[in-house]
Amino acid sequence: MERVTLALLLLAGLTALEANDPFANKDDPFYYDWKNLQLSGLICGGLLAIAGIAAVLSGKCKCKSSQKQHSPVPEKAIPLITPGSATTC
């Protein structure tokens, strides 16, 4: 078990070291500018959050309720657990 754990940790560590290559080729099609990607993601998320809060606070998005109020529990509820239905295993 210890050998498997050590092998998995070594495998994860080697891939992490390879991913943080400081001499990466910027012309490579798989090279990403992570700082700009993170910044644009945060800006997009912030704008969506502000738009969502504005939509909720504007009052234009209201639930249409019918005239008849529905109760969450039916009038004649069927009990799911009846006496004698429980077993001891």
Swiss-Prot record:
A molecular function GO annotation: sodium channel regulator activity
Cellular compartments annotated: Cell membrane; Basolateral cell membrane
Membrane topology per record: Single-pass type I membrane protein
Main location: membrane
InterPro entries with a match to the protein in the record: FXYD4, FXYD_motif, Ion-transport_regulator_FXYD
Extracellular topological domain: 21-38
Pfam family, one: ATP1G1_PLM_MAT8
GO biological process, one term: sodium ion transport
Segments on the Cytoplasmic face: 60-89
Entry function: Associates with and regulates the activity of the sodium/potassium-transporting ATPase (NKA) which catalyzes the hydrolysis of ATP coupled with the exchange of Na(+) and K(+) ions across the plasma membrane. Increases the apparent affinity of the transporter for Na(+) and increases NKA activity.
Subunit details: Regulatory subunit of the sodium/potassium-transporting ATPase which is composed of a catalytic alpha subunit, a non-catalytic beta subunit and a regulatory subunit. The regulatory subunit, a member of the FXYD protein family, modulates the enzymatic activity in a tissue- and isoform-specific way by changing affinities of the Na+/K+-ATPase toward Na(+), K(+) or ATP.
Family recorded in the similarity comment: Belongs to the FXYD family.
Name of the protein described by the UniProt record: FXYD domain-containing ion transport regulator 4
Native species: Homo sapiens (Human)
